[in-house]
Design a protein with these regions (language model features):
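A cross-family structural signal marking well-folded subdomains
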Residues: 1-128, 139
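Sequence context surrounding c-type heme c attachment/ligation sites in exported
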Residues: 78, 93-213
């Protein structure tokens, strides 16, 4: 790891395993997320690479990948996360004291590549966790999966209600019972990784859940 070529190892391994390569391709809806731009995109990727680099070079526990009480930010990323008193474009390690973030699942990179352009996706996020963290990828979805439905009143369902409808379908239930709980646990993060208390439909977010045995 002292060899400079190890930087390519970190970049490529993290890019493949964590799907960081997809950060360059995501295009959040400009009307919904007007603050998203190239500087933030680059900062997302760099934060995750630096955490991975830190765990390897400093021989830290691999548990830090999921529960680190620190991260790496520059001014642009710190502003996005609401971390005060960070100035300049260079990245530095900061402690996350009493923070809602911690580890990869609080990184804007992961939260953005597992979202749609205009909203979050508990299914994509849950699938990412099953595949990349737990090593238990779900089978492919059945064909002609229906879109998220609305309530009889015509108003959008909350994300949790929509997921419950999917689980009510026996064809969908076996996979969604595994994917939905970890995905819904990240619903307080919007489609570009900002913390929020209400969803796109203005409903109060319930991010509770229990993983099945």
């Amino acid at each position: 790891l002292d060899d400079r070529r190890s930087e390519a190892l970190i970049e490529n391994f993290a890019g493949q395993w964590l799907t960081l390569r997809n950060v360059s391709a995501v295009q959040p809806d400009e009307d919904v997320f007007p603050d998203f731009g190239e500087r933030l995109r680059q900062a997302f990727r760099r934060e995750t690479e630096l955490l991975f680099d830190s765990v390897l070079r400093e021989e830290r526990s691999t548990l830090d990948l999921l529960a680190a009480d620190y991260t790496f930010v520059n001014e642009r990323l710190a502003r996005h996360y609401g971390i005060p008193n960070i100035r300049g474009s260079h990245f530095r390690r900061v402690q996350l004291e009493d923070s809602v973030r911690g580890g990869l699942l609080g990184h804007g990179s992961i939260l953005t590549v597992t979202s749609y352009a205009n909203r979050t996706s508990p299914v994509l996020r849950g699938k990412w966790i099953l595949e990349n963290i737990l090593g238990t990828p779900p089978p492919p979805p059945p064909p002609d999966v229906p879109e998220l439905e609305t309530a009889e009143s015509g108003t959008p369902l909350s994300m949790r209600e929509a997921m419950e409808q999917h689980r009510a379908n026996p064809v969908c239930a076996s996979c969604h019972r595994l994917m939905d709980p970890p995905g819904l646990s990240l619903e307080n993060f919007d489609a570009i990784g900002r913390w929020r208390d209400r969803s796109e439909t203005k409903a109060v977010i319930d991010a509770s859940g229990v993983l099945p045995d």
